[in-house]
Swiss-Prot record:
The gene is ARD1. This is N-terminal acetyltransferase complex ARD1 subunit homolog. PROSITE patterns: GNAT. The keyword DNA-binding does not apply. It comes from Leishmania donovani. InterPro entries: Acyl_CoA_acyltransferase, GNAT_dom, NatB_acetyltransferase_subunit. Gene3D superfamilies: 3.40.630.30. GO terms for molecular function: protein-N-terminal amino-acid acetyltransferase activity. GO terms for cellular component: NatB complex. The keyword Transferase applies.
Length: 186
């Protein structure tokens, strides 16, 4: 059993256990604060119902303009102890639903390391497609870090109902990789 609820800024002081994975992107307090205050409906937590221990969370936002208005997943992370029980999938479904029903977005997008096959498999199960590759999107940690060199990201997208209204679908893959400076939303 799990309790799903809106994230608060105080939660950021308690979810280090969720962020232990080297594949989880972590941010500074002001970044989390910006998300919690500007897009509170997108910030979701899973906590253990009896211990209140953070189990998983998502960070998201609405961005873009016109036909590029979309939901964006900045982070989804599940604590190692609580993996393989669909917490990430449930949070991702909530984020897509929020993007569609509250924000009337055209699609949801996210970036994932090319080497993170487990996450890619989950996103594919949820209906996401690889829209494009962003070359050297993730910066390496150097010789002593877990990621020695820069790594490409896959920009994955999930079309929402409103995508049918676009002149060109948001999920037709690009035929070439791009550089980070070519991204529309920075």
């Amino acid at each position: 059993m799990t309790t799903y609820r809106r994230m608060t800024l105080c939660d950021t002081l308690q979810f280090n256990f969720v962020n232990l994975d080297q594949l989880t992107e972590t941010y500074n307090t002001s970044f989390y604060g910006e998300y919690v205050t500007h897009w509170p409906e997108y910030q979701r937590m899973c906590v253990h119902p009896t211990t209140n221990i953070p189990m998983a969370y998502t960070l998201g936002k609405a961005e873009g303009q016109g036909e590029d208005y979309h939901g964006h997943v900045s982070a989804v992370s599940v604590a190692p102890t609580f993996r393989r029980v669909a917490l990430g999938e449930t949070l991702m479904a909530e984020l897509a639903q929020m993007s569609e029903l509250v924000h009337n977005a055209y699609f949801v997008d996210l970036f994932v390391r090319k080497s993170n096959q487990v996450a890619q498999d989950m996103y594919h199960r949820l209906g996401y497609i690889v829209y494009r590759t962003v070359l050297n999107y993730y910066h390496g940690d150097g010789p002593k870090g877990p990621f020695k060199s820069d790594e490409d990201a896959l920009d994955m997208r999930l079309a929402l109902r409103r995508d049918k209204e676009r002149r060109k679908s948001s999920v037709i893959p690009l035929d070439r990789p791009i550089k980070p400076e070519e991204l529309e939303w920075v």
